[in-house]
From Swiss-Prot:
Top-level taxon in the UniProt lineage: Eukaryota
Lineage, broadest ranks: Eukaryota, Metazoa, Ecdysozoa, Arthropoda, Chelicerata
Catalytic activity field: a ubiquinone + NADH + 5 H(+)(in) = a ubiquinol + NAD(+) + 4 H(+)(out)
InterPro entries: NADH_UbQ/plastoQ_OxRdtase_su3, NDAH_ubi_oxred_su3_sf
Name of encoding gene: ND3
Keyword tags: Electron transport, Membrane, Mitochondrion, NAD, Respiratory chain, Translocase, Transmembrane, Transmembrane helix, Transport, Ubiquinone
Protein known as: NADH-ubiquinone oxidoreductase chain 3
One annotated GO molecular function: NADH dehydrogenase (ubiquinone) activity
Amino acid sequence: MIFYLHITIFLVVCLLMMLFFSLGFQGKKAKEKNSPFECGFDPFSLSRVPFSLKFFFVGIVFLIFDVEIVVILPFPLVMMTKNLMFVFSFTFINFLIVLGLLYEFKYSMLDRLK
């Protein structure tokens, strides 16, 4: 019975929040509020710099191989337990990461910036 009370309170709070957000204050949009602030001066140039897609790819590759290091480090301890399920899962994860590396080499994502 008390479980349903918690759910009911949660749903009422969610509905009230949705109501408040939908009826919330819609402020006037002004040029000054949407422009970047540079110590009270008008901006000299466009504040948005173009984003390098190559930099994004390098960051994603770094994250993938960082996760691979986290997977590889405990492998000697897993081998001591001699559990085949852990060994197969480790091999499968590393196989997927090697396939990703080959894909990156094929599409030259790992070349240096030109």
